[in-house]
Amino acid sequence: ATDAAPFGSLSVADIGGVAISTFNLLDSVRIIEEAYDEILEHDVIPLTMGGDHTITLPILRAIHKKHGKVGLVHIDAHADVNDHMFGEKIAHGTTFRRAVEEGLLDCDRVVQIGLRAQGYTAEDFNWCRTQGFRVVQAEECWHKSLAPLMAEVREKVGNGPVYLSFDIDGIDPAWAPGTGTPEIGGLTTIQAMEIIRGCQGLDLVGGDLVEVSPPYDTTGNTSLLGANLLYEMLCVMPGVVHR
């Protein structure tokens, strides 16, 4: 529908999975970072299928070594800026707090869309804002097209390198029930496509789609949605020809 031809204009390859240690989170984070260090020795833009949102931290670490600080378009029900989670400094709910602390993000070029989780307080979102993030809570997205918002996003993130991170729980569980931390009142599938298509023209240096959980996805609809959104992300990568 967008006339994008990613397979006709890019060299696209599935390079397989990263063999993590499922019993040691910190070791897995190390393994992922080392794998992406090797991947990024080549002229590639990695588009990654998670896994939970922990994976984004080691990927951003590797990307920082090549591109420096990056802007971020982050779609999620949760801000993922906890200082600790289950007593741990590194977990799926702490990713972007650690990324800020480690200097991986250009904070004035970060946008978070769809935040709404019941477990958060206003202060949690305010922490993001004090860092320079543009925070778009879910209720700001209800009953409307997000095309105007994405014009603001493109202006915010500008011409520098940008990473796109899409947590499937940013979408309402009516469409994406197969995830570990579903939250009502989320984005629609159409809005998700508007967000991704609105990233066309950005200097995307990587992206991921995370938190699809097949054991919770009894109908397969969430996996289908995730696969389609990954394809939408592929269609907005730099170098894709539109015919």
Predicted regions and their residues:
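Catalytic cores of soluble, metal-dependent hydrolases
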Residues: A1-L47, T54-K69, N126-T130, R134-R243
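Active-site glycine-rich loop that binds ribose-phosphate moieties when present
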Residues: I31, I55-P58, L72, A79-D83, ...
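Class I SAM-dependent methyltransferase core
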Residues: T48, H74
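Short acidic donor-binding/metal-coordinating loop in glycosyltransferase active sites
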Residues: G51, A77
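Conserved donor-binding loop and adjoining core beta-sheet/short helix segment
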Residues: D106
